[in-house]
UniProtKB/Swiss-Prot annotation:
Localization (cell): Cytoplasm
Gene Ontology terms for molecular function: ATP binding; pantothenate kinase activity
Keyword line: ATP-binding, Coenzyme A biosynthesis, Cytoplasm, Kinase, Nucleotide-binding, Transferase
Annotated protein name in UniProt: Pantothenate kinase
CDD domains associated with the record: PanK
Length: 314
């Protein structure tokens, strides 16, 4: 079924306001506690239990339906081919700008999906783990392009997701530290074959070079967390200043000088310069254009609360 736009054109999307979306929760129970939510929230992220109930429980219910339908389709194909029953992970991509709250969204989904009655094994992987080390970025002269498409080891990321999708028992991937602002030498994250794999990052919906596979080609469902650019900018600044008062105090922090040597005004100027020259440019040029590729878009208001949801039905 398609819906008509205000201009009368048919569209494969349906857009729901917050109340209409919240009603789709049906009888899905809220089993998350405030203490558990506190551990899942990102720095300066105000996501509340009301937000979980109204937005993420309906999303959990929808994903449950998607997973069941996808498993049935995969089983039918295996039966047709006469292959043994070797389930492959249901892969979810979570995209959006820096500071928009996509990491909190991904962690919430991991927790909520793992609480389904059949208790699926859910793994969460950030594409930050596939950033090139700072030494490589410096050598290539693109340290100021960190977060842009060319700063990621795209081949390694594609190989990881494709092998997981193919049913690999386990894989080791690098580990990125936001404290060190770099890949940690010698440290790895071991990903055991999950029932559901969530891949979170600013670049997960980006199109491939001509003739190549896109990461999104391996997704069964994709989600884009959206907000107005000026709101994201404000959230980014608030988060940076909160980190200055907390994580940056750690001597191991890459930005330790922001907490010890810079005034608050200097820290604000640094954050805004970084936003305008790196994050906003990347958002406008590389991230926002991928939004139409998402299965579902969460539109946030200035207070971080989701105001409306757009779902692609085909």
């Amino acid at each position: 079924m398609s819906h008509a736009t205000k201009n009368g054109f048919l569209t494969p999307y349906v857009e729901l306001d917050r109340q209409a979306w919240a009603e789709l929760r049906a009888a899905t129970p809220l089993s998350l506690t405030e203490a558990e939510l506190e551990k899942l929230r990102g720095t300066a992220d105000p996501t509340s239990l009301d937000e979980v109930r109204d937005i993420y429980l309906p999303l959990s219910r929808l994903l449950n339906l998607y997973v069941k339908a996808t498993r049935q389709r995969h089983a039918a194909v295996r039966d047709f081919l006469g292959e043994s029953d070797r389930p492959t992970p249901f892969v979810i991509g979570v995209a959006g700008s820096v500071a928009v709250g996509k990491s909190t969204t991904a962690r919430l989904l991991r927790t909520l999906l793992s609480q389904w009655p059949d208790h699926p094994h859910v793994e969460l992987v950030s594409t930050d783990n596939f950033l090139y080390p700072n030494a490589v970025l410096e050598e290539r002269g693109i340290m100021n392009r960190k977060g842009f498409p060319e700063s990621y080891d795209r081949r390694a990321l594609l190989r990881f997701v494709s092998e997981m999708k193919a049913g690999a028992d386990k894989m080791e991937i690098p580990v990125y530290s936001h404290l060190a602002y770099d890949i940690l030498p010698g440290e790895t994250q071991i990903v055991h074959r999950p029932d559901i794999l969530i891949v979170e990052g600013i670049n997960v919906l980006q199109p491939p070079p001509p003739g190549r596979l896109a990461l999104a080609d391996f997704f069964d469902f994709s989600l884009y967390v959206d907000a107005r650019v000026e709101h994201i900018r404000s959230w980014y600044l608030n988060r940076f200043l909160e980190l200055r008062r907390t994580a940056f105090e750690d001597p191991r922090s890459y930005f330790h000088a922001m907490a010890t040597s810079a005034s608050e005004e200097e820290a604000k100027e640094f954050a805004m310069h970084t936003w305008h020259t790196i994050n906003e440019v990347n958002l406008v040029e590389n991230i926002i254009p991928t939004r139409p590729r998402a299965t579902l878009v969460l539109f946030k208001g200035e207070d971080h609360r989701v105001r409306r949801v757009r779902l692609r039905k085909t």
